[in-house]
A protein has these predicted regions:
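Compositionally biased regions
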Residues: 8-9, 23-25, 75, 159
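N-terminal secretory signal peptides that target proteins for export/translocation
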Residues: 1-11
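Boundary at the C-terminal end of the N-terminal hydrophobic targeting segment
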Residues: 29-33
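A generic, residue-level signal for flexible/boundary positions that often mark functional hotspots
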Residues: 24, 48-50
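A cross-family detector of function-defining hotspots
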Residues: 36-44, 48, 55-166
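Bacterial N-terminal signal peptides
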Residues: 14-26
Length: 166
């Protein structure tokens, strides 16, 4: 009975299907390897280099002098509320007190809200649900920048810049 199945058309069809699937998977893997990874990082200068004049590497005293008194402060993080629509967290290295990350949140659309053009110098393609996101690493500058915008009429936009690990 087993011999009949092996010599049958079913067995040949099964083997042919396995070969086709194997070739297809190999082709997909090769195509993905050969494709240039979009937004994986570039060697160009980042467009978004500071927030309200504050840069990564600054010490806490410089930040507070530039941005004013934070709503909440600690050795590791300052939290600022500039308005109902704009909030910012500045993160510090506990040992050096230098800025390691800046994260800004905007609530709602309209004037004063940061755009992808201001962050990356170009528009970001929207996803099917209307949201947008992008992360770019800048190894020469020593940090990465991300932009995230939720879908809808009252979006939340988050922009973060953070030092790359050394």
């Amino acid at each position: 009975m087993t011999r009949r199945l092996r010599s049958s058309k079913f067995w040949l069809l099964n083997r042919a299907l396995l070969v086709v699937i194997s070739i297809s998977l190999a082709g997909v893997a090769l195509a993905q390897t050969a494709q240039k990874r979009p937004h994986a990082g570039t060697e160009e200068e980042p467009v978004f280099q500071d927030y309200r004049g504050v840069k990564l590497g600054w010490v806490a005293d410089e930040v507070r002098k530039k941005l004013g008194n934070p709503a909440n402060k600690s050795d590791e993080q300052d939290y600022y509320e500039f308005s109902d629509k704009e909030k910012c967290s500045v993160y510090y290295d506990k040992a050096t007190r230098q800025v390691t990350a800046i994260s800004v949140d905007f609530i709602g659309a309209g004037t004063g809200v940061i755009t992808p053009q201001q962050v990356f110098g170009a528009e970001i393609e929207a996803k099917s649900d209307g949201s947008k996101s992008r992360l770019v690493r800048y190894p020469k500058a020593g940090y990465w920048v991300s932009y995230s915008r939720t879908a809808g009429d009252n979006p939340i936009i988050s922009v973060t810049m953070q030092k790359l690990p050394q």
